[in-house]
């Protein structure tokens, strides 16, 4: 092999950075991997927020577990460092498109405040342990600068969790705990600075039995801080200026914290009520209306029981209003994932186009019937079909007691009445009484909605009508002669309509020609009128001629005046 071929072979091998990119992919900020990494970062950040300040204020805690603290400290530092690497491999949206170019990601990240805070949180301030000793955990306070990452993790979890209100309450409790924890640590540090047991306000002297234990020190400080910040108990009065300042700061913090907590709890409760109102109908107005209209107690009880069933069993009747803010395509996908399996079980909709079923799914209206309530009665005009989602319906006689059959979940009825099938002996009227045995959840599809959708799918309409004829033939409810007569009548009507359409086209053509002729005649008349107007302007009228004689200059008279003047001068000339 020649040297040139060796060079070409070497150049054709893929470079090493391409392999590295496979091992370090770009993360989608809305993806699962990024979400779980954020949740992982919660632990080192919470560790630094809670443990570092506690170790700084409780010396016994720092001295007793020094090796464990070193391991946890540098483990959290390692996670902090990895988090910076993750930030360099996390894409961002530009013009709605995820940017995966690592150079652009890095350039954008290093120009943000987040990068400066991340670097500052990793400054090795604990290197001062070499000179100051390993018992000064306050050197690690710069690790608190990574707190914005904690807030980001909480926000992502709140949007992803199935119980956002419960998570908001839990997040609020975490904030309250951290505030009380910090306050208790500062209280113990201030007591140590002022002297344990110097007065009733500071922490008691550890020389007393029981107060020397670390657990008692922390719990007493936490209890004292809870009393101050919640203002729900008697606390010893301060005796020194430092104690007064601490109490004033705590009281101000308590006022702000109380207002924040009440506002947050009110917001959570309001959101819960708003969500319930959006999902489930409010029965207060209906109850008030029934009382004002003096509805009988039995009917009022049935209405209230129906509302209670919806509320207790979390039944929704306004799915369209709930999903109205979603884009149309996304709303269709949600409806398909929820209801398509139910709709595809209906015989007349089997083997239909997927797009047709998707549009029909959006038209399904959930309905809930209470025990003993009739869904339809024999002889009623059928304007909708029903699909049983949950519950049992009975086909009963006219007396409402005798049962002929029981329909369960997944069955359907009324599908023939919403399709205009020629020769249907029952027409569009119901042929049976159907009553709900218990609480039943149904899907309703109206004839108008089906007609609106089928107007764009004529082939599917023909297929559905053919399936409906097959069903009626099996039920012996299809009059073939009547169907043939209706078909003949329809063909005759269509033929007449075609003839009328042809006549209408001919009339339109004649009318267009007549209109064109009228426009041409109008143009000719207008042209002739315009010529006459110009001619009348050029020819003088009799009155104008008399005025011209009066205003004529000497020597410029008419031919008659010239003749008279010549006749008078003739004799004189002869003389």
Swiss-Prot record:
Expressed in the olfactory epithelium. GO terms for molecular function: cAMP binding; intracellularly cyclic nucleotide-activated monoatomic cation channel activity; monoatomic ion channel activity. Residues 1-38, 92-116, 160-166, 274-575 are cytoplasmic. It catalyses: Ca(2+)(in) = Ca(2+)(out); Na(+)(in) = Na(+)(out); K(+)(in) = K(+)(out); NH4(+)(in) = NH4(+)(out). A motif (IQ-type) lies at residues 292-302. Residues 558-567 have a biased composition (Basic and acidic residues). The chain crosses the membrane at residues 39-60, 71-91, 117-135, 141-159, 167-190, 214-248, 249-273. Residues 231-234 are annotated as: Selectivity filter. Gene3D superfamilies: 1.10.287.70, 1.20.5.300, Helix hairpin bin, Jelly Rolls. Signal peptide: none annotated. This is Cyclic nucleotide-gated channel alpha-4. The olfactory cyclic nucleotide-gated channel is an heterotetramer composed of CNGA2, CNGA4 and CNGB1b subunits with 2:1:1 stoichiometry. It comes from Mus musculus (Mouse). A nucleoside 3',5'-cyclic phosphate binds at residues 348-471.
């Amino acid at each position: 092999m020649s040297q040139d071929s060796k060079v070409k072979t070497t150049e054709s091998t893929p470079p090493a950075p391409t392999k590295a990119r496979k091992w370090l992919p770009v993360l989608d900020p809305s993806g699962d991997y990024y979400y779980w990494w954020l949740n992982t970062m919660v632990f080192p950040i919470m560790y630094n927020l809670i443990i570092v300040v506690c170790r700084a204020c409780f010396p016994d805690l720092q001295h007793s577990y020094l090796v464990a603290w070193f391991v946890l400290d540098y483990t959290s530092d390692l996670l902090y460092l990895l988090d910076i690497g993750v930030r360099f491999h996390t894409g961002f949206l530009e013009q709605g498109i995820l940017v995966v170019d690592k150079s652009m990601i890095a350039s954008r990240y290093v120009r943000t405040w987040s990068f400066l805070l991340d670097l500052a949180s990793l400054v090795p301030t604990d290197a001062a342990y070499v000179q100051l000793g390993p018992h000064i955990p306050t050197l690690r306070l710069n690790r608190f600068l990574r707190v914005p990452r904690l807030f980001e993790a909480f926000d992502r979890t709140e949007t992803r969790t199935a119980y956002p209100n419960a998570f908001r309450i839990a997040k609020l409790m975490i904030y309250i705990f951290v505030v009380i924890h910090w306050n208790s640590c500062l209280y113990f540090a201030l007591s140590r600075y002022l002297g344990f047991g110097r007065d009733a306000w500071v922490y008691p002297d550890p020389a007393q039995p029981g107060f020397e234990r670390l657990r008692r020190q922390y719990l007493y400080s936490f209890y004292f801080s809870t009393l101050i910040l919640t203002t729900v108990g008697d606390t010893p009065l301060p005796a020194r200026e430092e104690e007064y300042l601490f109490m004033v700061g705590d009281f101000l913090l308590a006022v702000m914290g109380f207002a924040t907590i009440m506002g947050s709890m009110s917001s959570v409760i309001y959101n819960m009520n708003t969500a319930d109102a959006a999902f489930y109908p409010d029965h207060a107005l209906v109850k008030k209306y029934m009382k004002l209209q003096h509805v009988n107690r039995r009917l009022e009880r049935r209405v209230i029981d129906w509302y209670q069933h919806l509320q207790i069993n979390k039944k929704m009747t306004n799915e369209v209003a709930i999903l109205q803010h979603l884009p149309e395509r996304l709303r269709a996908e949600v409806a398909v994932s929820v209801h398509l399996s139910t709709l595809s079980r209906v015989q007349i909709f089997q083997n239909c186009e997927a797009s047709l079923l998707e549009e029909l799914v959006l038209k399904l209206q959930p309905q809930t019937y209470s025990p003993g309530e009739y869904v339809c009665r024999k002889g009623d005009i059928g304007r909708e079909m029903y699909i049983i989602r949950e519950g049992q319906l009975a086909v009963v006689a006219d007396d409402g007691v005798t049962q002929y059959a029981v329909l369960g979940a997944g069955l359907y009825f009324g599908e023939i009445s919403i399709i205009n099938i020629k020769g249907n002996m029952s027409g569009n009227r119901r042929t049976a009484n159907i009553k709900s045995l218990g609480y039943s959840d149904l899907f309703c599809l109206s004839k108008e909605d089906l007609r609106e959708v089928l107007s764009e799918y004529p082939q599917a309409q023909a297929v559905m009508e053919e399936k409906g004829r097959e069903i009626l033939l099996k039920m012996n409810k299809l009059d073939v002669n009547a169907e043939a007569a209706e078909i003949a009548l329809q063909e005759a009507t269509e033929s007449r309509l075609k003839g009328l359409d042809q006549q209408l086209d001919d009339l339109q053509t004649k009318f267009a020609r007549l209109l064109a002729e009228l426009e041409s005649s109008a143009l000719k008349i207008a042209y002739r009128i315009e010529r006459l107007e110009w001619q009348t302007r050029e020819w003088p009228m009799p009155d104008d001629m008399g005025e011209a004689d009066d205003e004529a200059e000497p020597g410029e008279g008419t031919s008659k005046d010239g003749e008279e003047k010549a006749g008078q001068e003739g004799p004189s000339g002869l003389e």
